[in-house]
Amino acid sequence: MMRKHVMAVMMAAAAAMVMAGCSGNNSEASKGAETAKTEAAGTQEAGTVPEAESYTIGIGQFAEHGSLDNCRTGFLQGLEKEGFKEGENLTVLYENAQTDGGTSSQIMDNFLAKKVDLICAIATPIAQSAYSAAKDTGVPVIYTAVTDPVLAELAAEDGTPVGNITGTSDKLPVENQLEMIRTMLPDAKTIGIMYSTSEVNSISAIEEYKEAASEYGFEIVESGVSSPADIPLAADSLLEKVDCMTNLTDNTVVSSLPLILDKAGKKGIPVFGSEVEQVKIGCLAAMGLDYISLGEQTGRMAAQVLRGEKKAEEMKFEVIEQAAFYGNSA
């Protein structure tokens, strides 16, 4: 009962912080990116697709976990709202790389061999593979859940595409997250972050955390891993050094999040997530994005390309700006 009471107080404080400070302090868009037009989702009628036309798309996903699964669900929902429905005028080929870079490349080669009309790449590593494989083929690539398209070399500094590729970014609302952690843990001094050294999306987020942490009275203690096999020992070591942990959208780490949560729970170390699915499986709270909405936004972009209204190479990448608070009351 005491734990639930303390948790309720912490959640109320965090919710108040969100209402007072974060509603107007959205996550920053990556430099040069176009902001999301949230009105479009609710007001735009389904797009017109010629009855005789049918399309085949390939969806390549880097890892199997909640946020990326939600992106895929949202992407297909976004396409359907625009008139492209799986099983009617849309054939969907789906493959998952299970966090393996070599498999990511094979997936893209397979899609191209099957002459897909468009590739959707979910997460940074497989988006890079898609760009490399498709750049001289004329097949457009639409990515989603790419934290920093510029650092990933998928966009120029001004947000314009580097080729026939565009999509959406899941740039983390880092300052909102730090403000939430400070509100919920007023005495905490150190935050641990585990990340994959091979994922540029995580390296970008780590740097942003390190730059902003001191403003909120925190020190960031980082731990890089090269594979899932490194995570158990890395977690044991990191948990000895920190007051809490916060999780990125790092695919390698998120795939092992239940293990990390188990180890942290045994030591009484709170773990914060970066989106709702991480909270659902045990993280204390998160200031994060809605990945279904991110996927829907990406689906709308893909629909424009399939209809021939725009080319991917003409579209700057887009960012959802609004961060939302998710809390675990269990």
Placement of each model-derived feature along the sequence:
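Hydrophobic alpha-helical segments within soluble ligand-binding/sensing domains
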Residues: 50-51, 148-190, 289-310
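Flexible loop/turn connectors
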Residues: 276-327
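Beta-alpha junction/loop-to-helix N-cap segments that form part of ligand/metal-binding clefts
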Residues: 97-156, 250-265, 269
